[in-house]
Amino acid sequence: MIPMILYASETGNAQDTAERVARAFRANGRAVTCLPMDQFPISALPHTYLLILLTSTHGRGDPPPAMLPLWTALLRSSLPEDILEDVHFALFGLGDSSYERFCYAGKMLLRRMEQLGATKMGEPAWGDERSPNGIEDAFLPWLQQTLDLYLPYLPLISPTPKIIESTVLPPPIYKISPASTSKSVEHDLSLERLSISFPIPNGKPAPVRVEDQARDKASTSRTKPDDWVWATLKKNIRLTSKDWWQDVREIELEFDDPDTKPYTAGSICSLQPQSREDDVNMFLEMMELTSQADEVVTIESLLDEQPLPSHLPPAGTPTTLRSLLTNHLDIRYSPRKSFFEWLRRLSTNEMERERLDEFISDPDEIHTYATRPSRTIVETLADFRFTRIPMSHILEILPPLRRRQFSIASSWEDHPGKVQLLVALIEYKTNLKIPRKGLCSSWLNGLPVGTRIPIHIASPTLFLPQDPEVPIILVGPGTGVAPMRAFVEIRVRQGAAKNTSLYFGCRSSTTDYFFESEWDVHREKGVKIQVAASRDQEERIYVQHLIKRDKEYVKEWIVDKKGWLFISGSSNAMPREVREAVAWCISKEGAGDMTEEESKAYVEQMFEDKRGGEESW
């Protein structure tokens, strides 16, 4: 009997926490499997006797993308009420109590598991980033409770004594081995097997030979997963004025395959960035691994019950350490507590060990040193120069290089065969000497036009009403206007311009007014477009102020005509304030006849009924 740990992570917190749980079980001599929820075969759930679930919460209390397949299956009305009667589960949710629906995805999952007959093992816990010690305040007692409840059911797989978390390096669970250079491996390294290509502008991908592999810089090669497609960068244009502090780009990608299936407005485009070459070289040099960086290797799991993570190449696939660091592992990640726990096990210097003990025992120390200044793993390792991460543990210690998701800013109908994105280049200063730059945005901006990259198109999270007569109100400040632009294009084509309203927000009409000329054209066709340029007057004006100004028609569209509401943009106060503004418009204070409580409930019910949606980040 092997417990199954399933996690759904948005930024990596839930994955990091799940892996800590797995290490705790293994430290106690027990076997355990740890997987993202979307890698777990759903049909096996009723037969999974011991289950441990960890999930973060996405957007307005929504499940993270990795949880959606499992969650959708659990919501099927045809499921018997006792289908999970053999399942015993523990649950830990991660969230931030400053948000309205704190740990909502975890709470929904808990309720549904119990509805289907599953039995709780102990009380669930909710990790709160706002707690004095972050999620640790809830996690550590919950972990001990879970171990106490589960361990008696599990046989010891090793007679070795319990590993002391902070001082002893546990055995590796993954292995990096030299690959044979036989002809069969040479064939495996071909383009057909690995889908490796080099970004030669306007060129075709070049095949890789074994004898060239050690010389080629893996940082310039890409692999394409089966469900991704090739696209070519056609356009990279700055939309903000040159003297404006923020650089926002319109990126256009063209599908290489003319038979690519059209995407739907509201769809999401995923990109897989690459680590910077200088960071990779610095890591290799500090870890004294430069001489091994370009040797052809394969990877495998050393535990039968633990498959390789999905962010790594499949077992047996020839690769190099340089390629792993460039395409699969994130060395610019800001380290969490678990990373410092690993360093504590590896350090050979007494002063370093004392400093690492301080980090492990005090979350504020980690926040001050790493989180607040966005210090990276590479920079952290430079500070702990007596610590080396061995090849045997690199795959376990370094976090995955996560794909980045962007709302598609175009409709297929207006831009056939192309995807347009609105990308803000992230750059800011902290107390560190070197300015911080977003990994994906800086990587994307550095690609020359003509570069071929793999992209993935995911199903929409926002859907237009099927009936074009239904009025819609779109609210998209800043880069949040991306999916709204696609919706406006579709509605104009449907002849529904007069039933479409857009509220766009920017700092100034002269600096960051995205797609201004397009909005002028759409206005002439009947689209109601209101722009809140917050800094163009003495008193700052935001989209929620314009919504309140238009209270009569907002009430008419939302209540009388049963219109839809869409909100997209930053997940700070904006979405909540927009919902409150709409609720005010339909209340007695505005232009309606509802009480304050009734109007807020009406807006919430709109989202429950899928009369619109919210996309925030």
Swiss-Prot record:
Boundaries of every FAD-binding FR-type domain copy: 226-465
One cellular component term from this protein's GO annotations in UniProt: cytosol
SUPFAM superfamilies: Ferredoxin reductase-like, C-terminal NADP-linked domain (SSF52343), Flavoproteins (SSF52218), Riboflavin synthase domain-like (SSF63380)
Gene3D superfamilies, sorted: 3.40.50.360, NADPH-cytochrome p450 Reductase, Chain A, domain 3, Nucleotide-binding domain of ferredoxin-NADP reductase (FNR) module, Translation factors
Residue positions binding FMN: 9-14, 56-59, 94-103, 129
UniProt keyword annotations, A-Z: Cytoplasm, FAD, Flavoprotein, FMN, Mitochondrion, NADP, Oxidoreductase
Entry-linked InterPro entries: CysJ-like_FAD-binding (IPR003097), FAD-bd_FR_type (IPR017927), Flavdoxin-like (IPR001094), Flavodoxin/NO_synth (IPR008254), Flavoprot_Pyr_Nucl_cyt_Rdtase (IPR001709), Flavoprotein-like_sf (IPR029039), FNR_nucleotide-bd (IPR039261), NADPH_Cyt_P450_Rdtase_alpha (IPR023173)
EC numbers for this chain: 1.18.1.-
Cysteines engaged in disulfide bonds, as pairs: none
GO aspect biological process, one term: iron-sulfur cluster assembly
Main localisation: cytoplasm
GO molecular function, a single term: NADP binding
Localization, UniProt: Cytoplasm; Mitochondrion
Span of domain Flavodoxin-like: 3-147
Residues noted as binding FAD in the record, renumbered to the chain: R404, Q405, F406, S407, G438, L439, C440, S441, W617
Reactions it catalyzes: 2 oxidized [2Fe-2S]-[protein] + NADPH = 2 reduced [2Fe-2S]-[protein] + NADP(+) + H(+)
Cofactor: FAD; FMN
A Pfam entry, by short name: Flavodoxin_1
Top-rank lineage group of the source organism: Eukaryota
Keyword field contains Mitochondrion: yes
Ligand binding (NADP(+)): T479, S534, R535, R540, I541, Y542, V543, Q544
Enzyme kind, highest EC tier: oxidoreductase
Family designation: Belongs to the NADPH-dependent diflavin oxidoreductase NDOR1 family. In the N-terminal section; belongs to the flavodoxin family.
Function: NADPH-dependent reductase which is a central component of the cytosolic iron-sulfur (Fe-S) protein assembly (CIA) machinery. Transfers electrons from NADPH via its FAD and FMN prosthetic groups to the [2Fe-2S] cluster of DRE2, another key component of the CIA machinery. In turn, this reduced cluster provides electrons for assembly of cytosolic iron-sulfur cluster proteins. Positively controls H(2)O(2)-induced cell death.
Record text on subunit structure and interactions: Interacts with DRE2; as part of the cytosolic iron-sulfur (Fe-S) protein assembly (CIA) machinery.
UniProt protein name: NADPH-dependent diflavin oxidoreductase 1
Species of the source: Cryptococcus neoformans var. neoformans serotype D (strain JEC21 / ATCC MYA-565) (Filobasidiella neoformans)
Gene designation per UniProt: TAH18
